[in-house]
Amino acid sequence: HAEGTYTSDVSSYLQDQAAKEFVSWLKTGR
C-alpha cells in the first residue's frame, strides 16, 4: 500500500535524523 510505504519511509527518515542529532549531542558532551 502506497500510504503504508510512505509512512514507513518517513518514520525511518525521522529515526535516522534523530540518531544523527543524538550522536552530535553526545559529541558536544551536553
From Swiss-Prot:
Disulfide bonds: none annotated. It is found in: Secreted. GO terms for cellular component: extracellular region. The modification Arginine amide is found at R30. The keyword Secreted applies. PROSITE patterns: GLUCAGON. Keywords: Amidation, Secreted. Pfam families: Hormone_2. Gene3D superfamilies: 6.10.250.590. It comes from the Eukaryota. One of its GO terms (biological process) is response to starvation. GO terms for molecular function: glucagon receptor binding; hormone activity. The keyword Hydrolase does not apply. Belongs to the glucagon family. This is Glucagon-like peptide. It comes from Anguilla anguilla (European freshwater eel).
